[in-house]
Amino acid sequence: IEKAYMKIHGGYDFPGSNSGIDLYALTGWIPEGFHMHDEKFQKHRTWQRLVNAHKYGDCLVTVATGQMPEEKADALGLVPTHAYAVLDVREACGVRMVLVKNPWAHMRWKGKYSPEDTKSWTVAMRRALRYDQLSAMQRDNGIFWIDYASMCEAFNGLYLNWNRDLFQHHTSHHRFWPANDHGPKNDSYNVGYNPQYTLTVQAPAAKDPSLPKSRSSSAVWLLLSRHVVNKRAESDTTPNQYLTLHVYKNKKRMFYPQKPYMSAPYSNNPHTLVRFDVPPGETLTYTIVVSQYEKEFDLSYTLDVFSMANFRLVPLSRTLGSEVRLDGKWSSSSGGGKVSSAGGSARHITFMNNPQFRLKLA
């Protein structure tokens, strides 16, 4: 498996990935990642999602450490820039606990609630988790319990891979976006030439009207995946391709990047996920805009739409309803009484000599 995975990524010198990307390549389950040290990370809400997902077996969970000094890593019992599997998620005696495994099958957590921690563990907690602390002390198999608060502090990345069968409706759209395409290199002021789509979602009515709308809404997930086309050429350029998706609540092509309804931060991760919900009983149309931070390289990508409700995805045409082209030129005065049509800026008295056109909208 490792050889096959490395081959499709161009060899063992590929730029690297994370456990969420790897699990998507191996299983096809939808990747979602969080930086637990980010100020926008919602610790409580994420815990609830972890508990619910683990209860039904619809999510693979992994965590990863970041860079850290060797002394700190030894003190914590962790491996820097290393991925760990999450085996269990539970709350015991009011403490949020996570069962983690080092895939090396040795080297484990030395902090709070480690096997050597005799102060934090209580008889009630050990009983609730069916944890034999004495046996754990005698054998280091890389498996350990850690409280959720310590996990969020000691680890950097949290990666969730969701079962795509959770969604009844799905479609994929593949596209090539050349770097020399029309439009500015930086789309901060104009996204009119970016690839765009209209997405119409028909959310069914709530089965139980007494439930709040948030519990009856239809989930819609958009996954933008960048293709690896030329492995050698992309080994240096890939980190510079920062992509995102912008979602607007309208039915037409966007030209100016106003504040979107939903969006994701620009990232050089090959997968970008945007999630939102459609209220029950409503049919809403959205415009989806694919964006690059700096359009320097050709981009081949896939846009996947996963939805609990029926939907229709249509690529937006760049062709406008009416188009007229007029040829003209700026010319300088060449004598003989001819007036220059290059009148300059509005600060010049000759400004009115610039070419002018009248536009009448019917």
Language-model segment annotations:
Residues 1-362:
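Accessory/interaction modules and long regulatory regions
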